[in-house]
Swiss-Prot record:
Cofactor (UniProt): adenosylcob(III)alamin
Family, as annotated: Belongs to the class II ribonucleoside-triphosphate reductase family.
Protein name: Adenosylcobalamin-dependent ribonucleoside-triphosphate reductase
UniProt KW keywords: Allosteric enzyme, Cobalamin, Cobalt, Disulfide bond, DNA replication, Oxidoreductase, Redox-active center
Pfam family, one: RNR-II_ins_dom
Entry EC number(s): 1.17.4.2
Quaternary structure and partners: Monomer.
Coiled coil: none
Chain residue ranges for the region called Effector region-1: 147-158
């Protein structure tokens, strides 16, 4: 393999001298605590210029033409492209996904082929492991096993991804009868540092257990793969097809699992110890044993996935993100979170949605659930399979392998397929002098290269090679349209009738300038993909564009999140920090208000006054003032003219608008591919992440801030390695992984 593409120090110095990053009010702080990796040789975490260099070099070197003796002309061309990308990302006119900001260009990326993708989807049905990095020793590669989709989910969650999974009736019906109840004993050596804590959650001392001819013993290696294989073995022993010897006793030895607080060298952070795994294994075994002689239900399968997600949360740089997709007439699935005990124990681990098609009409109970607790969400698989952008019309089977979606709902996915995201802030890019068509072309090429990663799972490799799906998103959409047009995209509504139900409806009227703007950019993305695909000799991407929810990444640039309206014209935004976080002294020195977090010990809540882009515009609207009808209409606009994948949106509604949910879901059934809704809470919760304030309060609080956090932090020189990242819900639905 040839020497890779690298960016020179001279070039980076020129960019730093000429380009100012468009940090939002929380931008640099959010970057430093979330995406700046530790540099052991320098005894500090990365600076922004170093992060962008790592990220861009990690991506540009995925171009497959670099594998074999590339010409000087090719290397020069790719170096120039890397320089354009560097300048774009450094200025925050666009960014790759948060996953890429954290992982791209690291040894972990080079070792772990799946590491650059945010989220995945898997169907919960027996599947073959195939030629994957993880294959249980007792299985042939082509042998179907009940454990496989659970192993896939567990593995991808531990790599930091989110996973959508389908427990629709068509999948669950393929799972055979549970043949055996398994006597599971989890053991830990009495000399282990984790012994006492492990016994408290159900393990026993190793010397207390006697192996016999009827038992299977497995000592887990201290690896991610070891955790996955232990769970796979446990699941598969319950089924005669994968337990031909009819063994009914399993001893899992967790003595080698590193203790709580030990360093995780690959993904980063510190270990949780074996305790969450012990609890997970015992709980999953109970779910399966309870169905011995019978069949698993969609709720059982979702419980297993949720228990896995609960265990994975126990790391300091991950939040387990799951979306459970069930059948729309499966009342047990729809109501599964009403069991408060199980909700508190593990069912919180997924957002739940139901699959519908455009002929579906049973929205009344769904709307009732949404008004009560914001669930279920809606995923229209019929639209996803047969439409790109809605304006381009019906295209039978254009995405025919689609079975579900990622946890945030912006990408329709086939079994084993991942999201592959890049985000453009069009207003910021334009202000920095960029031609938006070039920006979106660079974005498409960046995402295309990610599809050439060496994926760990066979199902993923095969579908990625076929689809080469990319998801080029725009964020700060409300900022851009309001600034460029002087008004919001929905200019009004006109009276009409539903063509099938003949119900009276209000049809949105869109600003035609906005239609032209997004249509031109969509075509620029498609053209860039066509050209690059031809150059690389690979399939064109099956779909290209999306709108992602963009919580953390939008904070970097200070933009509105995806298509969402700002939560308020003026806000107090709160971020929680571990008390030992070196950013805290700098924030206090600069005048930011801080107080002890009332929800979590050893945590400090810091308040940031924020003014939304366009707050003074008379046509500005916030999530607290914009109507539910306009939010639906805005999502429909983007699904019609911009996104050929889907549009992630959490529509917020006031109590007085709850009775509109059912009719609006029905009205947009031919347009919107996925959506979720939540009641608007304003700032009513104590220490709420976002609290709307008035202009006077904003100006008063802003005057209290007297310093630049980045400069003060540098002067204090107090960086710390492996800090715990305190969890916060950055996207409305809480579905996104932190990174």
């Amino acid at each position: 393999m040839s020497e890779g593409i690298s960016l020179s120090a001279e070039f980076i110095d020129r960019v730093k001298a000429s380009v100012k990053p468009h940090w939002g009010k929380l931008g640099w702080v959010t970057y430093k605590r979330t995406y700046a990796r530790w540099l052991p040789e320098k005894g500090r975490s990365e600076n922004w210029d170093e992060t962008v260099k790592r990220v861009v070099e990690g991506n540009i070197n995925l171009d497959p033409r670099l594998q074999d003796s590339p010409s000087l002309e090719l290397k020069q061309s790719l170096t120039e492209e890397a320089e354009r990308l560097y300048k774009l990302i450094y200025g925050l006119g666009a960014t790759p996904s948060g996953r890429n900001l954290w992982i791209s260009g690291t040894d972990y990326q080079r070792r772990t082929g799946d590491s650059l993708n945010n989220c995945w989807f898997v169907a919960i049905r027996p599947q073959k492991y195939g030629d994957s990095k993880i294959v249980p020793s007792y299985l042939g590669k082509q042998e179907k096993a009940v454990s496989m989709p659970f192993s896939f989910l567990f593995d991808e969650l531990m790599k930091g991804g989110g996973v959508g999974f389908s427990v629709a009736r068509s999948n669950i019906s393929q799972i055979p009868r549970v043949d055996f109840a398994i006597d599971l004993q989890v053991v830990v050596d009495e000399s282990s540092e984790s012994y006492d804590a492990s016994v408290k959650v159900g393990a026993v001392g190793k010397n207390e257990v006697v192996q016999d001819a009827d038992s299977i013993y497995y000592r887990l290696p201290d690896t991610r793969e070891g955790w996955v294989l232990a769970n796979a073995l446990l699941i598969d022993l319950h089924f005669a097809q994968t337990n031909p010897d009819r063994k009914q006793k399993l001893i899992l030895d967790l003595s080698d699992i590193r203790p709580y607080g030990a360093e995780i060298h690959g993904f980063g952070g510190t270990a949780s110890g074996p305790m969450p795994l012990i609890s997970m294994l015992l709980d999953i075994n109970e779910v399966l044993n309870n169905k011995a002689g019978g069949r698993l239900t969609s709720v059982d399968a979702a419980d297993i996935c949720n228990l896995i997600g609960k265990a994975v949360v126990a790391g300091n740089v991950r939040r387990s993100a799951e979306l459970a997709l069930g059948s729309n007439d499966d009342q047990d699935f729809i109501s599964m979170k009403q069991d408060q005990e199980k909700l508190m124990h593990h069912r919180w681990a997924s957002n739940n949605s139901v699959a519908v098609d455009s002929a579906f009409s049973g929205y009344q109970p769904i709307a009732a659930g949404i008004r009560e607790n914001g669930e279920p969400g809606i995923v229209n698989l019929d639209l996803s399979k047969n439409y790109g952008r809605i304006v381009d019309g019906y295209q039978a089977g254009i995405d025919g392998d689609v079975e579900g979606t990622n946890p945030c709902g912006e990408i329709s996915l086939a079994n084993g397929e991942p999201c592959n995201l890049f985000e453009v802030f069009p207003l910021i890019a334009e202000e920095q002098g960029w031609d938006l068509q070039e920006v979106f072309a660079l974005a498409a090429r960046y995402a295309k290269r990610v599809t050439f990663s060496p994926y760990d799972w066979e199902i993923s490799r095969e579908i990625i090679q076929k689809n080469r799906r990319i998801g080029i998103s725009m964020s700060g959409i409300q900022d851009w349209l309001l600034t460029r047009l002087g008004n919001r995209v929905v200019t009004g509504f006109k009276d009409d009738f539903d063509p099938e139900t003949h119900e009276a409806i209000k049809v949105p009227v869109y600003d035609k300038r906005a239609i032209k703007m997004v249509d031109q950019l969509y075509k620029a993305v498609v053209k860039a993909d066509q050209d690059y695909s031809k150059t690389l000799g690979c399939n064109e991407s099956i779909k290209h564009t999306t709108v992602k929810p963009s919580g953390t990444v939008a904070k970097l640039a200070g933009a509105s999140e995806g298509m969402h309206f700002h939560y308020g014209a003026y806000l107090i935004q709160r971020i929680r920090f571990q008390n030992s976080d070196p950013l805290l002294p700098a924030l206090k020195a600069c005048g930011y208000r801080t107080e002890a977090d009332i929800y979590t010990e050893n945590t400090t809540c810091v308040e940031f006054p924020v003014k939304a882009v366009g707050a003074d515009n008379p046509n500005f609207a916030s999530a607290g003032t914009v109507s539910i009808a306009e939010q639906f209409a805005t999502q429909a606009f983007l699904q019609t003219y911009w996104s050929d994948n889907a549009v992630s949106c959490t529509i917020t509604f006031q109590d007085s608008e709850g009775d509109q949910v059912e009719s609006l879901l029905r009205q947009y059934r031919f347009i919107i591919k996925s959506t979720s809704l939540l009641p608007y809470f304003g700032g009513s919760l104590q220490q709420a992440p976002k609290e709307p304030i008035d202009k006077e309060t904003y100006e008063k609080r802003s005057q209290e801030i007297t310093g630049n956090v980045e400069e003060v932090f540098s002067q204090l020189n107090s960086d710390v390695k492996d800090l715990e990242l305190v969890d916060q819900t950055d996207c409305e639905g809480g579905a996104c992984p932190i990174k």
